[in-house]
């Protein structure tokens, strides 16, 4: 009898164990409710009423805010003097590095009777003359734009200690000419859209066409990604990067912005910006494609794991490319479709190639990745409890039989 009892107990234990083993895969497998990827939420028409603010309450890694007093524009990243009578700029200084860098001694614009008072609002300083506008940016590159609607001469004096001054001209194309130079070990460039440069020593004569755009931009002195910044300057010089838009979302559906233009006919502006989502418009009257840079602070557009980016152009998904060099240097050879690449620069910086820049609506969304499936969902947990109950009952019966 003892042998028979032990055999029955063993069978009961084996059956219980088999039941547990058969139920555990249910508990541990993919039977938990699936977590579908979050859908791309449409930006409603009510969002388009958001009004960007002008003053930047705190410096960001993308831009800060100018203060303009007594003819001097003071910023976190850039500083210069402005003559309201002649429209001349003096001593453009980059403040990004450990020590200030004097990039430009002076800029004198021919035929510049000031049309209205100069003003600084947020990261933008703007002064207008006769058919010409100066726009300076308080950003790490000390970006400066001079847009002219008539042919004119602009004289730029570089510091006497400038080195590696180099002129590149490609007549008949936009970007027609560029001048690169180094000051105190830091690199900077001048870009001219349709006209040409003459360089004598440290004097640069920019012959602007009608209309034309003269741009200054430097490699941020404190950056750990100088090679990537040089690639950006190369792409601007080649005419492949045509605009930049820096965005930081704040409370109540508002945002701060810093738009930069590298081609005179391309406009890029935000329609709505909030944490994790932005709607942007790109437009031009010229055919052909190019790259636009869209930069966000990490809080506005998280891109690090476990989040991912969704980019759409006119409602169509845009594929991500890891071939940034082709995107910058030969975008047309890479693909005829829109594509984007993430640049290793501060914040979330997207290089977006568009095969056409005419009337393009761009959406960028940061989507949290689904959390890992829990080891036990409610249904699986109930199955495990039932299995353990069976084991307990079988064990109790086995013990009673042994006692008998």
Model-found features: residue ranges?
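C-terminal beta-strand-rich structural cap/linker in extracellular carbohydrate-active enzymes
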Residues: 328-370
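Surface-exposed beta-strand/loop patches in extracellular or lumenal glycoproteins
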Residues: 156, 283-309
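Long, low-hydrophobicity ectodomains and other hydrophilic envelope-associated domains
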Residues: 39-289, 317, 324-330
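Short, surface-exposed loop motifs enriched in S/T, G, D/E and P with embedded aromatic residues
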Residues: 318-323, 338-340
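Secretory targeting signatures
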Residues: 1-68, 73-75, 311, 360-404
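Solvent-exposed loop and beta-edge segments used for protein-protein assembly and interaction
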Residues: 272-276, 286-288, 303-305, 344-346, ...
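Short, hydrophobic/aromatic-enriched beta-strand segments in well-ordered soluble domains
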Residues: 280-286, 294, 362-368
């Amino acid at each position: 009898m003892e042998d028979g009892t032990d055999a029955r107990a063993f069978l009961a234990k084996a059956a219980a164990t088999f039941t547990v083993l058969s139920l555990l895969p249910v508990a541990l497998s993919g039977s938990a409710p699936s977590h579908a990827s979050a859908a791309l939420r449409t930006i409603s028409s009510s969002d388009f009423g958001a009004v960007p603010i002008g003053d930047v309450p705190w410096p960001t890694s993308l831009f800060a805010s100018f203060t303009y007093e007594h003819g001097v524009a003071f910023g976190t990243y850039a500083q210069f003097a402005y003559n309201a009578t002649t429209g001349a700029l003096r001593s453009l200084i980059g403040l990004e590095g450990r020590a200030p860098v004097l990039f430009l001694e002076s800029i004198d614009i021919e035929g510049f009777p000031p049309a209205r008072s100069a003003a600084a609002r947020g990261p933008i300083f703007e002064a207008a003359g006769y058919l010409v506008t100066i726009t300076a940016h308080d950003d790490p590159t000390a970006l400066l734009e001079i847009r002219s609607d008539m042919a004119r001469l602009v004289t730029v004096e570089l510091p006497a200690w400038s080195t590696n001054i180099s002129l590149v001209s490609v007549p008949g194309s936009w970007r027609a000419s560029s001048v690169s130079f180094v000051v105190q070990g830091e690199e900077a460039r001048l870009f001219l859209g349709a006209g040409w440069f003459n360089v004598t020593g440290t004097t640069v004569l920019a012959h602007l066409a009608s209309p034309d755009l003269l741009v200054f931009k430097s490699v941020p002195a404190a950056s750990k990604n100088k090679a990537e910044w040089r690639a950006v300057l190369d792409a601007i010089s080649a005419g492949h990067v045509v605009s930049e838009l820096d965005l930081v979302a704040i409370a109540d559906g508002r945002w701060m912005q810093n738009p930069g233009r590298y081609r005179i006919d391309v406009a890029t502006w935000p329609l709505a910006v909030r944490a994790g989502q932005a709607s942007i418009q790109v437009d031009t009257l010229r055919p052909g494609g190019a790259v636009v840079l869209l930069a966000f602070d990490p809080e506005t557009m998280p891109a690090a794991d476990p989040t991912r980016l969704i980019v759409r152009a006119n409602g169509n998904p845009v594929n991500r490319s890891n071939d940034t060099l082709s995107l910058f240097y030969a975008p047309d050879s890479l693909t005829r479709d829109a594509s984007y690449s993430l640049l290793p620069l501060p914040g979330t910086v997207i290089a977006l190639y568009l095969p056409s820049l005419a009337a393009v609506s761009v959406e960028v969304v940061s989507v949290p990745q689904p959390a890992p499936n829990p080891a036990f969902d409610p249904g699986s947990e109930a199955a495990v409890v039932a299995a353990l109950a069976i084991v307990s009952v079988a064990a109790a019966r086995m013990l009673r039989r042994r006692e008998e």
